[in-house]
A protein has these predicted regions:
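Auxiliary Fe-S-binding modules of radical SAM enzymes
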Residues: 1-17, 26, 32-42, 47-58, ...
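Flexible, acidic/Gly-rich N-terminal and inter-domain linker regions that tether
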Residues: 1-125
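Generic domain-boundary/flexible-linker signal
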Residues: 13, 58-61, 75, 141, ...
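A general structural-boundary detector
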Residues: 37, 117, 122, 126, ...
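Structured core elements
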Residues: 46-49, 129, 175, 238
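Conserved Radical SAM active-site core
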Residues: 66-232
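Conserved AdoMet/S-adenosylmethionine-binding subsite of the radical SAM
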Residues: 155-330
């Protein structure tokens, strides 16, 4: 179904088809078609970590797949918590391919000397990449869809992980991504705080930054805590603004982007610029999906961001076919350059990421 039909045709008919497609795709990996909403005496668990706000009966599975009461009761899949999280972690040499590396302390000289010991990119150091399993969205074009496949062996203890990270003094930052961190925000907050507390006790001069990359659908109180950690440590937060129109977000990602836009606006209005002009606290990012996230969509997103603050960094990413959209081509060069030019009309700091993929077009 094309972009024009999604935005302009009979929405009730379009929506029915969209939900059917997502239902079939999610069934392939054992996930519910929509967020469960148990009622009355059937309620066994309520979760408010993200926009989906699942209400589970004993037979339900949360939309993210991380909370399965039946499997929890037999010990097959314990619930994630503040002290345990489903995560795949590894060290990544700085500067990394992180979406914000073009302006962060690890990839530039920004942040020196308050948040980095290097007056240049931090070569010879590492970022701890914390890949979270589970997601509050269900993107048909997901570039990291392995997050849907996890088991008990992927459950890590927060203290053990914090000690491992602190022990390696070459690790200068922690980046949460996934999936998306929202379904496990309490764990991410606890881990970040423990690392920073341990470093402060052991060696007060060590610089250590914490960053989040997410779809922005999280609980307001929790994302506020994340922002404060990122702000104080010299890290930042990247929002995936996958689309501007809610209908398009529902079509591509299965979930509304209403809370994403609200959360972006809230954090930007309250925190962006508080560290000064040289250290952006947050950014926006958009994957240019051919035929869907075109220059018109990019213009709406760029305009939305600019109305909050023109200095907020915005990154446009080249798409390559993956997951259920493997048949789509790489973002055409003309589309990428046109979108870049349009975004630059609205914003002062625009970046084109994954440029190497243009060599395959």
């Amino acid at each position: 179904m094309c972009r024009k039909c999604i935005l302009n045709k009979d929405w009730e008919k379009i929506k029915s088809h969209i939900l059917s497609v997502h239902s079939q795709v999610r069934k392939l990996v054992g996930l519910p078609a929509k967020p469960p909403k148990a009622e009355g005496s059937n309620i066994h668990l309520k979760c408010n970590y993200c926009i989906n706000e699942c209400v589970l009966s004993k037979d339900d599975i949360s939309y993210c797949g991380l909370r399965n009461i039946s499997k929890k009761e037999i010990g097959e899949l314990p619930f994630p918590s503040r002290s345990k999280g489903y995560i795949h972690g590894y060290i990544d040499a700085n500067p990394t391919n992180c979406c914000n590396a073009w302006f962060c302390p690890a990839g530039t000289s920004r942040g020196y000397p308050n948040y980095s010991d290097y007056n240049e990119p931090e070569f010879g150091t590492y970022s701890y990449a914390a890949f979270f399993y589970g997601c509050s969205f269900s993107c048909l074009f997901c570039q990291n869809w392995s997050h849907k496949n996890f088991s008990k062996r992927n459950l890590f203890d927060v203290d053990r992980l914090a000690n491992q990270i602190v022990k390696n003094k070459k690790i200068t930052c922690l980046c949460y991504f996934g999936g998306t961190p929202e379904p496990q925000l309490p764990f991410s907050i606890n881990l970040a705080n423990k690392i920073l507390e341990k470093i402060k006790k052991l060696e007060s001069k060590r610089k250590f930054r914490v960053c989040w990359e997410w779809n922005g659908s999280g609980n307001r109180d929790l994302i506020d805590k994340c922002m404060k950690i990122a702000l104080n440590s010299g890290g930042n937060i990247k929002f995936d603004l996958k689309s501007f129109h809610e209908k398009l977000n529902l079509a591509l990602c299965g979930v509304s982007n209403k809370r994403t836009l609200e959360n972006f606006k809230y954090l930007a209005e309250n925190y962006f610029g508080t560290r000064g002009d040289d250290m952006p606290e947050m950014s926006a990012c958009t994957l240019m999906v051919p035929g869907y996230t075109n220059h018109e969509e990019v213009e709406q997103i760029a305009k939305f961001v600019s109305e909050i603050n023109k200095k907020i960094p915005y990154s446009l990413l080249i798409f390559h076919g993956d997951y259920q959209m493997r048949d789509l081509p790489i973002t055409p060069r003309d589309q990428a350059l046109k979108s870049l030019k349009i975004a630059q009309k609205y914003l002062d700091n625009v970046n084109l990421g994954n440029k190497f993929l243009l060599g395959f077009t």
